From Swiss-Prot:
The chain crosses the membrane at residues 25-45, 69-90, 105-125, 170-190, 218-238, 280-300, 312-332, 339-358. It is a multi-pass membrane protein. Component of the ubiquinol-cytochrome c reductase complex (complex III or cytochrome b-c1 complex) that is part of the mitochondrial respiratory chain. The b-c1 complex mediates electron transfer from ubiquinol to cytochrome c. Contributes to the generation of a proton gradient across the mitochondrial membrane that is then used for ATP synthesis. Keywords: Electron transport, Heme, Iron, Membrane, Metal-binding, Mitochondrion, Mitochondrion inner membrane, Respiratory chain, Transmembrane, Transmembrane helix, Transport, Ubiquinone. This is Cytochrome b. Heme b b566 binds at H89, H188.
Length: 371
């Protein structure tokens, strides 16, 4: 067996024989990242980070730049595809106990936070009506920070309101953060292969491993092909499926949209924020909705790694999935009954999963006569 590091990393990497399709999403995320970086570069070449020209420059890209419409749609819909893959990737980690590889899990959650920041900055760049107001509402949450809030907000905005300096710095951040994501992704993969992937049974896979290439690389290729095919179908036939109608109008600080909401992939966190009728409480809940994922490796009490043989934990996991979908749906609705109570119930259920996990693990140990 040759001992060349690159060959070992990509070809002769030993992987468990029984890993399922749920393990394909890492390579799909890598493809999404490559696609976003490439299309983002071509868009940045033609984009102008100025509040008077940004909206027009997007129209110029779509209408006048050769294949500009495709680059713009691939970048916008590619972001949605990125988040679909990352949420499934995290759900897989929660279900199969991948979080017990602590360093990999921590680097992954850090990646998620940077990715969400990058996507938020990107959403502001077209300078459409919803871009402007979503940026105003979300950045305004910084004012909830005691003592430092107003100073922090003014510092982020580069003035006393969202204006040209804000757009310029958001563009700079949106351009530079993907490089941080690329470097951290490399670290994420290196940390993963220190210990190796887990598997659906949650057992030690060392007794039965096969080379990554050709076995798992071809398996990855199938789902990658389906993802790219889906992406191209949406780009070609339904390019505006994820767009907000308000964002087809140029930003107007004097007209507030009837219902301000971010992109769909932030709606679960936005729904949790809205469910608390207090600015600081809502901002804390918003941050905690992501940060609570960091606690999972330390609250695992079950003797079994995976949820495959843990019916109570499975029930809570699928409750979490349905809760996530319900919060996302409720956050698209206006703040009025019955959506207020739906948001509050689902937000409570969301956090209940993380609180109940250690209790259920302990209970399942008792049921299976483990100490």
């Amino acid at each position: 067996m040759p001992h060349h590091y690159i060959l070992t990393l990509f070809g002769l990497l030993p992987v468990a024989t029984n890993i399922s399709t749920w393990w394909n999403f890492g390579s799909m995320l890598l493809t999404c990242l490559a696609l976003q970086t490439l299309t983002g570069f071509f868009l940045a070449v033609h984009y102008t980070a100025n509040i008077n020209l940004a909206f027009s420059s997007i129209i110029h890209i779509i209408r006048d730049v050769p294949h500009g419409w495709m680059m713009q749609n691939l970048h916008a819909i590619g972001a949605s595809m990125f988040f679909i893959c990352i949420y499934i990737h995290i759900a897989r980690g929660l279900y199969y106990g991948s979080y017990l590889n602590k360093e990999t899990w921590m680097s992954g959650i850090t990646l998620l936070i940077i990715l969400m920041a990058t996507a938020f900055f990107g959403y502001v760049l077209p300078w459409g009506q919803m871009s402007f107001w979503a940026a105003t509402v979300i950045t305004n949450l910084l004012t909830a920070v005691p003592y430092l809030g107003t100073t922090l907000t003014t510092w982020l905005w580069g003035g006393f309101a969202i204006n040209d300096p804000t757009l310029t710095r958001f563009f700079a951040l949106h351009f530079i953060l993907p490089f941080a994501i690329i470097s951290l992704s490399s670290l994420h993969v290196i940390l993963l292969h220190e210990e190796g992937s887990s598997n659906p049974l949650g057992t030690n896979p060392d007794i039965d491993k096969i080379p990554f290439h050709p076995y798992h690389s071809y398996k990855d290729l199938l789902l990658l092909t389906l993802m790219i095919l889906s992406l191209l179908i949406i780009v070609s036939f339904f390019p505006d499926i994820f767009n907000d109608p308000d964002n087809f109008s140029k930003a107007n600080p004097l007209v507030t949209p009837q219902h301000i909401k971010p992109e769909w992939y932030f709606l679960f966190a936005y729904g949790i924020l809205r469910s608390i009728p207090n600015k600081l409480g809502g901002a804390l809940a918003l941050v905690m909705s992501i940060m609570i994922l960091l606690t999972i490796p330390f609250t695992h009490t079950s003797t079994m790694r995976s949820m495959t043989f843990r019916p109570l934990s499975q029930l809570m996991f699928w409750t979490l999935v349905s809760t996530f979908i319900t919060i996302t749906w409720a956050a698209t609705k206006p703040v009025e009954p019955p959506f207020i109570i739906i948001s509050q119930v689902t937000a409570t259920l969301y956090f209940t999963f993380f609180i109940s996990t250690p209790i259920l693990g302990w209970l399942e140990n008792k049921m299976t006569n483990h100490p």
